[in-house]
């Protein structure tokens, strides 16, 4: 194998975009979001994402970035909350990502109308897992992605799985080396 297969930055960037941004990845177990208003935040792929089970029981994912000034909205890995407030200027969002509180909103003179929502990412709950695609404006086709593997996932009974331990291993290498 040619060494450029592992060292070419342009190739790496294309692979990273395709594999880790435009592909559905497991964000968490369904049991990590056991009831309405529970959330799980992560930024394993250098994009901060928060997955929220809404008051309606629906799972949604958003960039964990305040649309006002780009600060993190959710600062803890997991928990329960019916609203999320950015520490920077106090913008507050509900479990659907909609802004429900913007301090001194009138002073913006309507210039923030397009920023009154957290940026959504495609998310879907299946087989006891929550899948998220880290490309906000993309379309996630989970059935095509999983194919026949979906039936295999069902047989694992992951809907009842409980997280026992979290371990993180950080390796500075091309993703192909770690596989």
Enumerate the language-model features and the residues they cover.
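Glycine-rich active-site/cofactor-binding loop and its immediate structural neighborhood
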Residues: 38-87
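Rieske [2Fe-2S] iron-sulfur-binding subdomain
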Residues: 1-59, 92-179
